[in-house]
Amino acid sequence: MFYNNPLLIKLKNKLYKKKKIEGIVKSTTKGFGFLEVDSKKTYFIPSKNMKKVIHGDRIIGLIKLENNKEIVYPKILIEPFLKKFIGSILKKNNIIYIQANYPYIKDLIFYRYKTSVFRSWKNGDWVIAELDTHSLRDNNHFSINILKFISEKNDPLTPWNVILSKYNLEKKSPKINFNYILNNNNLKDKRIDLTYLDFITIDNSNTQDIDDALFVKKTKKNKLTLIVAIADPTEYILINTKVDDIAKKRVFTNYLPGFNISMLPKEFSEDLCSLKPHVKRPVLACKIIIDNEGKILMKKTKFFLAWIESKGKLSYQNVSNWLEKLGNWQPDNKKIKKQILLLYKMYKIRNMWRKKNALIFPDNIEYKFHLSKTWEILNISVEKRSIAHKIVEESMISANICAASFLKKKLGFGLYNSHSGFDTFNAKNAINFLKKYNIIFTLEEIMTLSGFCKLKRKLNKLSNKYINYRIQKFQSFGEISLIPKPHFSLGLPYYATWTSPIRKYSDMINHRLIKSIIIGKKKISPPDTNIIPQIIHRKYKIRMALKEIEEWLYFKYYNKKKSDKKKYQANIIDISKGGIKARLLKTGAYIFIPVTYIHKIRHELNLNSEKGIIYIKNKIYYKVSDIIIVSLLKINNGNKKIIATMIN
């Protein structure tokens, strides 16, 4: 009887007029939205009120009661979500509109804008813009400022240009006035001449920035002496110089489909420092003695400065084919042949030692985009890691193990790659999960390096991809540390990389530390602590840019095959309430299968994201790691997602 009482409604509204709430705006595809106060409480924002705000805005809203329902009226903007963004031009009847290209706000179109960019705008032009005025703060309207033109719609390089702009990453390798570069370090007298040794390089056939060369020989006592020689850019690049500042800002060489954007000017990375064949080059070298069981005799490890001359630039494919007795390629001479065979022997005994005493990363399939000269996608191929890849990788891991030990012993600091295995909370979850499969570990055991290695070896023998997936989910992320810490995933007490100083600034830092020890520098300072968050942030941006460029290229590739009704094998990699995320085995493209295409009767379906399992009528039908058969339904132009359906 009180439900529609006018006096009661009036009283409630009086109370609600004073009720203000702060939260974050969440939009929906249907126009209305919600104000999220915390993870448990949200308030409804009708479509008309959503026109004053943008998804992600932090606002203060007034709560009113309408039809006995709590409604938010946005009142004060605390912080706008949209600041600088990527957008595209829409041109209708000679009127310019700008559409934001951002998740959740793709439907937001601005028609008020200003710009200092002089251009006759075309439909589909990509731009960088920033929010100038906000409807909730400035005169009830939105407006933007177009800062920069990125690319035309039909430019074949648009995917690269747009995504690199989105993450504020460079589109070209750095350029400098190369004439000023001199040998500033005066270390010529401290370098040992090893140009007479038969060093070789093994890389991709088109690689120009060659940063490692290898030489190995057998000793009288049936041991192997491996010398890993690494290009030495710090011979020419002093700390806090212009080129060093460039490298410090870029942090990594950015490897993208079709081309690379180098960390250093190419005059350094592909010429002056590159270990090209038959050219004398300065290097930082590590001599590693390996016994016949594959163990590194750490006390006999030696770091030193040297001159080398590579006797041959070999490709991964040719070396692998020759070792597997495939194809027609032959080493140029007996000396190179001997080096390949000895390196292969080194790989086998070192790999065997690490399997027994540390951990080996599983082989992951990689995919390569084959592009035409006009940047069209010709094909996508599966790239498996070859024997030659593994030879070089094993050599670099050995050198990095030695560097970690050397820096720990001499300085007690450096840039260390570390991984802590599990935190306490997830260790307990992992233990409880493993019990279901009769795999028993204590908390104390699983949180030690030896216990973690024991677990991983047991799982490798078990060869259950689902269990591996669940355990992987419980694991911590890798870290960078200034002090020596264990690397659980490698099964090593400490690990520090230094073998790619022309591609990674962190390796250049460790280079300088090792060189400082070699030349007897008295005062050696630890790396600046600010470099670690910079490396992590830059790595994240590069990884996200690569992911989104590849998504765009997959979109282009499959957009041409819209009518393709082929069946594809796909690996389930994630399960959420909304559906299945999977990866096509043939090309590596990520697909999404909405819940409606998994099973027609929704109430019979249970998608457990935590367990990574799909139940139908309470029976397990699909789980993460399963291989399923799918067909592609549609390609979403807005978010570049590929939608697929299950084929039973």
Curated annotation (Swiss-Prot):
Predominant location: cytoplasm
A molecular function GO annotation: exoribonuclease II activity
Keyword RNA-binding belongs to the record: yes
Every RNB domain range: 191-518
Gene Ontology CC terms: cytosol
The UniProt record lists the keyword Metal-binding: no
GO BP terms: mRNA catabolic process
Protein EC: 3.1.13.1
Localization per record: Cytoplasm
Domain S1 motif: 565-647
Alphabetical UniProt keywords: Cytoplasm, Exonuclease, Hydrolase, Nuclease, RNA-binding
EC category name: hydrolase
SUPFAM superfamilies: Nucleic acid-binding proteins
Catalysis: reaction(s): Exonucleolytic cleavage in the 3'- to 5'-direction to yield nucleoside 5'-phosphates
Pfam families per the UniProt record, alphabetical: OB_RNB (PF08206), RNB (PF00773)
Alphabetical list of Gene3D superfamilies matching this protein: 2.40.50.640, Nucleic acid-binding proteins
PANTHER family: EXORIBONUCLEASE 2, RIBONUCLEASE
Family that this chain belongs to: Belongs to the RNR ribonuclease family. RNase II subfamily.
Its biological purpose: Involved in mRNA degradation. Hydrolyzes single-stranded polyribonucleotides processively in the 3' to 5' direction.
Annotated protein name in UniProt: Exoribonuclease 2
Organism: Buchnera aphidicola subsp. Cinara cedri (strain Cc)
